Amino acid sequence: IYLDTSGVGLHKRGYRRNSNDAPIKETLAAGIVDLARARADSVVVDPMCGSGTFLIESAYKALKVAPGLRRNFAAEQWSQIPETAWRNARAEAMDAIDRQGAFKAFGFDVDDMAVELTRNNAKKAGVGSKLTVKQQDISKYSQIEGSITIVNPPYGERMLEIKEAEELYKKMGQRLCPSKENPCYII
């Protein structure tokens, strides 16, 4: 027996209509954010933010936003489950959101279209006010004291030529300085 309760795959949280090349799945990003231990008072930075997935998932974690809050499920159409059950579950999830958290996120990307994409996705996700995003190359990046850096740089033949990749990784090595106070997670 097979019942599709979800409809669209659960890795789609409902906030990302558009993305850039080779985006990370929201669920994978959420798992990495968990490993990075982003909390309500964290400052999270993604110096190559692309469509903003790490920043948004960090905000969701820090603010206690339920991951499926902004999406619909196939089971919502089932007559066996009253519509009030879905409404009540969403209301409960909305009440659980920590709107007072000091969480902040900063995103940078060399591509101004990616910056705009991140802003749009964050707004759709309801966390736009917690993110600051600007166009900037990794070579200009300065570590923000006390921050958690999470980055998924373009890699391999899917995005860069070998020479470009080597140059990018060299810049990353010069600009990203992980420490106990400033952990860095690179995929």
PLM segments and residue spans:
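Non-catalytic surface loops within mature trypsin-like serine protease
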Residues: 5-7, 112, 155
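Non-catalytic substrate-recognition/targeting regions of SAM-dependent transferases
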Residues: 1-18
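A short alpha-helix capping/helix-coil boundary motif
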Residues: 8-9, 96-101, 152
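Conserved S-adenosyl-L-methionine
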Residues: 24-142, 158, 164
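Residue-level marker of regulatory loop/turn positions in helix-turn-helix DNA-binding domains and
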Residues: 21
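Preference for short coil/turn "hinge" residues that link or interrupt alpha-helices
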Residues: 8, 17, 31, 131-134, ...
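C-terminal catalytic and target-recognition region of SAM-dependent MTase-like enzymes
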Residues: 137-187
